[in-house]
Every structure is written in C-alpha cells, then in structure tokens.
C-alpha cells in the first residue's frame, strides 16, 4: 500500500512593513527621483493617474502601471543594487530566525525584490510581475486574494502545508492568514503579535 507523500511545511511572509519597516516600492520610487532627477518630469503624469484612480476611472493596478514607467529612464539593475546596499540593514532581525521553507508574497515588483531575495537566501519569492525592460505590470497586482492565487500557481495545494503566516495588513492579507495551520502573526512596528484568526475575522 502506497502512503501519501509528506507535505512540505512552509511559512508565508508579506514583505513591506513586515520584513522591512517601510513600503519598499515607494522608497525605491523616491530614491530614483533623487538619484535620477530627470524622472521628476514624469510626476505630472503620475499625479494625473492618481487623480483618475481617486475618482474611479483607474483601478489601483492601472495606477501602478503608470507609476513604473520611470523604470524606462534609469539604469535599473544598478539602481536596485545600490538601493539595497543602503536599505538592506533595515530588514527585521527576527526574519533571520526562520526555521522552515519560507515564501515571501508581495505586491512590490519582482525585478526589485529579486535582489534582496538573493541576499536573504529566500526559498521562494512571489511578487507582482513586471516587464523587466519597461517596468510595466504583467497581469494583476499581487495583493489580497491574488496572493493566494499566485501561491497555488507555484505550488500544488495538496503538496504544501502552510504553518505560520506573517503580515502587517489584517485588511489585505486576510486571505493568506486563512491558510495558516499554525500561527498568525500581525506585524506592528516590527514586532510579531500572535493572534487567533477566528478572533479577528469573525463570521458574519
């Protein structure tokens, strides 16, 4: 009689305001505006796109597509490396204590997080897909329910056991918290605060 293969135990982490205490995509945007000041010429277009989002003409993913057009005008690989040379030190110390296969799922750009993922020896990175040359978003922004969808594109649901989940956002990461068979950790100012899923997300 064949026994079922043992499931892989994994922990899931958000990235921004979880592993680092800031929104890395926004920080990189500001960094590029300072170090590559010609990108400032794009700000009126980005501001207009922001207004269109506020009035409901653009959705958030469309707004992000406009924001990342600045990638066309910078030395992307050099900028990303120099950014993380400066900001890697802000990674939360407790992240180095991880004990099992770690999956980071983030709405930040894949081309931007791949560098820090290598430096931190992450097991798996799932992030918003971008065209590596143009910076344009490919598909959907990796946030909310999209995180779960992307997880199961990478792993067969029957082959993994989600143990612990870490995120700063109780609102947007409800869906990945629901996967936890171990513990849920709400990250508040860098501190891990354990909570019971059923206490926070009451039915009805």
What are these regions (language model features)?
Residues 16, 55, 68-71, 83, ...:
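A general boundary/transition motif marking the beginning of the first structured unit of a protein
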Residues 2-10, 80-204:
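C-terminal cap/substrate-recognition subdomain and adjoining C-terminal extension
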Residues 27-28, 46, 62, 66, ...:
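Exposed alpha-helical structural elements
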Residues 42-68, 117-120, 124-125:
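Short, compositionally biased "basic patch" segments
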Residues 2-55:
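Active-site neighborhood of HAD-like aspartate-dependent phosphohydrolases
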Residues 21-22, 60, 144:
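Generic structural signal for well-ordered secondary structure
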Residues 61-91:
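Metal-dependent phosphoesterase signature
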